[in-house]
From Swiss-Prot:
The species this protein was found in: Azoarcus sp. (strain BH72)
Family from the record: Belongs to the UPF0161 family.
Membrane topology per record: Peripheral membrane protein
Protein name per UniProt: Putative membrane protein insertion efficiency factor
Keyword Cell cycle: no
Function (record text): Could be involved in insertion of integral membrane proteins into the membrane.
InterPro entries: Membr_insert_effic_factor_YidD
UniProt cross-references to HAMAP family, sorted A to Z: UPF0161_YidD
Compartments it resides in: Cell inner membrane
């Protein structure tokens, strides 16, 4: 499951994200964060952390440096 999520995230990062432009307010970007979270914490907790991060990535949030816990 972990490998499948990482492959899907990398596909998004290299195939879809360049067409959308740099929109993430955080460093590392949301896709980089998601890959690292899944690698470090496993599929379930990593996906939960990534979903929480994407929910915070909007124009009204200041963004900034936000590493994977």
């Amino acid at each position: 499951m972990k490998t499948v999520l990482i492959v899907l995230l990398r596909f998004y990062r290299y195939a879809i994200s360049p067409m959308l432009g740099r929109n993430c307010r955080f460093h590392p970007s949301c896709s980089e964060y998601a890959i690292e979270a899944v690698q470090r914490h496993g599929a379930v907790r990593g996906a939960w952390l990534a979903a929480r991060r994407v929910a915070r990535c909007h124009p009204f949030h200041p963004g900034g440096y936000d590493p994977v816990p």
